[in-house]
Amino acid sequence: MISDIIKELEEKMTKSISALKKELTSMKAGRANPAMLDRIEVDYYGTMTPLNQLANISVPESRVLMIQPWDKSAMKSIEKAILISDLGLNPSNDGTTMRLVIPELTEETRKNIVKNVKKAGEDGKVALRAIRRDANDKVKSLKKDNSITEDEMKSAENDIQKKTDSYVKEIDKMVEAKEKEIMSI
């Protein structure tokens, strides 16, 4: 019973960490990274489709992303999706390929990105706390039903807290690494 609760807790926390990792990867850091475009969806024949399913995205130079759509008729839609995204990138389109030059980050831009990184990290921690609360509630309900003893409940809550602390440390490390990456370019 308790082991199932802890296993579920770990699965949910791992998913939460993965989501944060993906979000941090998509935040631009002055270097070209295909993951920056992961959240861009293109209106492709009336259906919102992820950009990475419509085109090959490569990094020919450290600050350039090259997009080669498999269907050249989607070029205008891709360009429009990039322009309306919050990335602030201006695509140059030659009809068959599209190039995105990642601008140098100003000090102000870096600070704004770091602020967003910290906010994403804090949101990740809030999600972990909610998962911890759910797990603790399940343990308490087991105690209420007299399925476990008081000592087992305290032990389980202690285990849950230790797991939560380790995942929070992981978030702190991820946020710190991303901040360092942004500020060192």
Swiss-Prot record:
GO terms for molecular function: ribosomal large subunit binding. The gene is frr. Keywords: Cytoplasm, Protein biosynthesis. Its main location: cytoplasm. The lineage of its organism: Bacteria, Bacillati, Bacillota, Clostridia, Eubacteriales. One of its GO terms (cellular component) is cytoplasm. Disulfide bonds: none annotated. Responsible for the release of ribosomes from messenger RNA at the termination of protein biosynthesis. May increase the efficiency of translation by recycling ribosomes from one round of translation to another. It is found in: Cytoplasm. The keyword Cytoplasm applies. It comes from Clostridium acetobutylicum (strain ATCC 824 / DSM 792 / JCM 1419 / IAM 19013 / LMG 5710 / NBRC 13948 / NRRL B-527 / VKM B-1787 / 2291 / W). This is Ribosome-recycling factor. It comes from the Bacteria. Transmembrane segments: none annotated. Pfam families: RRF. The keyword Cytoplasm applies. Belongs to the RRF family. GO terms for biological process: translational termination.
